[in-house]
Amino acid sequence: MKLIKKLLEDEEDSFFKNKIVFKNFVIKKVFKKYLQFINVTTGNNENSSVDLQSLCTQLINEFGHLELSVQKAQTISETCTDETLYYQQLSKQREIEIENEKKEIAILKETLDYEKKQRQYKEQYLALYKAINEKPSTEQTEKEIEKAQKELNEITDQTNKTTSKLELRTKQFQLLLHTLNELEKNLDESIPFIENSNNNNNNSNSDQSNTPMES
């Protein structure tokens, strides 16, 4: 969660900083073209019509570049925000699942301990019962022994089932932890990609500013 929060804050800071720098640069460039356009329209130069057409074309192109750059920046920002929110929601979901698994494992451990004690009591009772009835047992005694043996078998089966379920939940819990680790690893790998996308956008804007103007 801390990593996701930091990623979101860094992304917002980087976006707004780049947006301010880009906005100032583009506005200055467009304004410069606009001033040149105004100077030509108010001048008495014989070639003013040719210059006016050329500057008008350049000004339109600058506005086109501005619109395209803004669309690119907006698309990148929306994509990064959507991905960050997705990973944040996925991480919260995994944390909830892990907490639920922990609670279920704790309950299963308590159940297993209780059943082990019950089995121990039954075994002690059966051993004592057999010791008391060392002589040939009557029909009633045999029924009691058979009943106690049946209860012992049921407790043994239930204990085995609980043990198997506990092992399964433990494996599922370990899988959830592994999934969360993979999620954090993917986030770590996505940070350079986001920063690289922002750097590429800045480089593209810089290249446009260095392009010679048509005369």
UniProtKB/Swiss-Prot annotation:
Record field: compositional bias (Low complexity): 196-215
Function: May act as component of the THO subcomplex of the TREX complex which is thought to couple mRNA transcription, processing and nuclear export, and which specifically associates with spliced mRNA and not with unspliced pre-mRNA.
Signal peptide residues on this chain, from the entry's feature table: none
Region (Disordered): 193-215
Principal place of residence: cytoplasm
Locations listed in the record: Cytoplasm; Nucleus; Nucleus speckle
Family: Belongs to the THOC7 family.
GO biological process: mRNA export from nucleus; mRNA processing
UniProt KW Transferase keyword: no
Subunit and interaction comment: Component of the THO subcomplex of the transcription/export (TREX) complex which seems to have a dynamic structure involving ATP-dependent remodeling.
Coiled coil, from the record: 88-191
Keyword annotations from UniProtKB, A to Z: Coiled coil, Cytoplasm, Nucleus
GO cellular component: cytoplasm; nuclear speck; THO complex part of transcription export complex
Top-rank lineage group of the source organism: Eukaryota
Official protein name in the record: THO complex subunit 7 homolog
